[in-house]
Amino acid sequence: VSGITITDPLVTVSGTIASLAPGAIDITSFSAIYTITQADVDAGSVTNQATASGTDPSGNPVTDTSDDPTTVTPDDSTVTPFTPNATIALEKTSTFNDTNANGFADAGETITYGFKVTNTGSVTVTGITITDPLVTVSGSIATLAPGGVDTTTFSAVYTITQADVDAGSVTNQATASGTDPS
């Protein structure tokens, strides 16, 4: 077979084989590099199949599609899986609202909570919400890409009770949750 080239829907393959004898194998003549996209990472894999084309000695076209050597199915696409890493980090801040300006917390005054959500993983996280046992947290993040930070979506206000004043502080912890693409 002569004039062998490879076409691939994801990449431009460089190289050519001028001629390949029956039974011969050439694994060094072609190369291609594919850059993984965020959509690939979110999907959990890249699926791809290339086609080799050439001409037999009679001038007839000869083609074959690539095969994933890890399966028994002939001429199937090669799947490169990724391990998803869906992680988010939550930071919670508080601001005491001293409405009577006496410098002390009084029952009926409020604490405003701010929340910072960071996607520290490798996949896009969707439907992010925050729960807090002390307050109702308003807001929801539809999607947050890897490395993304949101500091404006969520907020909550807590009204200080006399028990809080007597205790000298208010302590609680919030939890952020979301859904990975899989």
Predicted regions and their residues:
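Exported/extracytosolic protein signature
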Residues: 1-182
